[in-house]
């Protein structure tokens, strides 16, 4: 099962139930289907080079607005920091999910050179204020993995969870240090 057809099938199946419970296996399947890296056609479309410089700008604008829109939808669910400059020089957003062992940074985007690293550091500091003893995990936006690989000097390490690339920065001291000592 892959692509939009698979996602719609899973959603219909979940909505048709009388009981609202959803198993972890079903959530993983839905994540694989909805995540563009899980669908070869979507993955190919993501990496298709733009036909012209004008098209590239249009695509960048579309991506910024799409992520900003997605962030707006989630503002009520999870604490989110999002910003967008009207001069199109920068769009940035991060989302903190404190309900798990890891603090997740689900979205992070910057389209201006040099500001991505600062946004990442700001998001990390916000996550550490939220839960000082927990490590911080970042789910990279497909196609942005190279940027995060360059952040290793700041303590970010690449891993894979459920077949998806993630970047984790461990907590300094506290519970994380105690677990390593065991």
Model region roles, listed by residue range:
Residues 1-8, 13:
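Hydrophobic, membrane-inserting alpha-helical segments
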Residues 8, 15, 25-26, 173-175:
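Glycine-biased, low-complexity coil/linker segments
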Residues 16-73:
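Short amphipathic alpha-helix that is part of the acyltransferase structural core
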Residues 73-92:
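Conserved beta-hairpin
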Residues 90, 132, 140-165:
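Conserved active-site alpha-helix within GNAT-family acetyltransferase domains
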Residues 97-112:
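Conserved acetyl-CoA binding element of GNAT-fold acetyltransferases
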Residues 105, 135-140:
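Conserved hydrophobic beta-strand within the GNAT/NAT acetyltransferase core sheet
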Residues 112-127:
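Conserved acetyl-CoA-binding loop-helix of GNAT-fold acetyltransferases
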């Amino acid at each position: 099962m892959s692509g939009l057809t698979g996602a719609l099938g899973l959603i219909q199946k979940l909505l048709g139930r009388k009981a609202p419970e959803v198993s972890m296996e079903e959530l993983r399947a839905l994540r694989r289907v909805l995540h563009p890296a899980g669908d070869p056609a979507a993955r190919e479309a993501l990496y298709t080079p733009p036909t012209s410089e004008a098209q590239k700008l249009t695509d960048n604008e579309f991506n910024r607005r799409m992520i900003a829109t997605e962030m707006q939808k989630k503002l009520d669910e999870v604490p989110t920091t999002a910003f967008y400059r009207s001069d199109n020089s920068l769009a940035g957003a991060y989302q903190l999910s404190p309900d798990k062992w890891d603090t997740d940074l689900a979205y992070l985007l910057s389209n201006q050179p040099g500001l991505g690293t600062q946004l990442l550091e700001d998001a990390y500091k916000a996550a550490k204020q939220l839960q000082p003893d927990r490590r911080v995990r970042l789910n990279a936006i497909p196609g942005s993995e190279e940027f995060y690989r360059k952040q290793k000097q700041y303590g970010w390490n690449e891993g894979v969870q459920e077949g998806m690339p993630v970047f984790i920065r461990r907590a300094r001291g506290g519970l994380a240090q105690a677990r390593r000592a065991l």
